[in-house]
UniProtKB/Swiss-Prot annotation:
PTM description: Phosphorylated by ATM in response to DNA damage. Phosphorylation prevents degradation by the proteasome, hence stabilization of the protein and accumulation within cells.
Official protein name in the record: SOSS complex subunit B1
One protein family per Pfam: Ssb-like_OB
Ranges of biased composition (kind: Low complexity): 131-148, 166-178
Organism: Mus musculus
Sequence positions bearing Phosphothreonine: T117
Lineage: Eukaryota, Metazoa, Chordata, Craniata, Vertebrata
PANTHER family found in the cross-reference section: OB FOLD NUCLEIC ACID BINDING PROTEIN-RELATED (PTHR13356), SOSS COMPLEX SUBUNIT B1 (PTHR13356:SF3)
Amino acid sequence: MTTETFVKDIKPGLKNLNLIFIVLETGRVTKTKDGHEVRTCKVADKTGSINISVWDDVGNLIQPGDIIRLTKGYASVFKGCLTLYTGRGGDLQKIGEFCMVYSEVPNFSEPNPEYNTQQAPNKSVQNNDNSPTAPQATTGPPAASPASENQNGNGLSTQLGPVGGPHPSHTPSHPPSTRITRSQPNHTPSGPPGPSSNPVSNGKETRRSSKR
């Protein structure tokens, strides 16, 4: 025989749950993207109440006051609230109406901060695993980009500046060189007066020799 579980003993992640409960409320129908209809119902036994998610036609058949036996159900946290589901091969069977002792409190489907803290570390770990990679990816390109920009754009402009600077410096250097070339003729008469006197003396000698 299957052992029955009380609402107070339901924990997230439990499977193959067998319960007997009474339906207190039936919620609104919501449709999924696949076209399925989902209804959340509030059920209870003598230990407390909990929400159960029922799909499609079964949800339309359930009415408040029905006493139902759940077989092969499972529990999970949905939006921070503990919720019952019918698993694969699970079944909901109506076994009676109204005559059942139940307690609406405590409501185990109320938001529980413990469930949020259990889910938060997992999300934070995933964020931490992704965050280092993201900053590395962001810091890498910008670090390389400014360097490349400085080398390609600003670097070239700064290099062009000094390169342009030396050209004017070279241009004045060229005029002095031209002045030097001009000064060479000046220097040549001043420098070679000795040799010039020699040709003059040689010329006189030649003239004297010619006169002789």
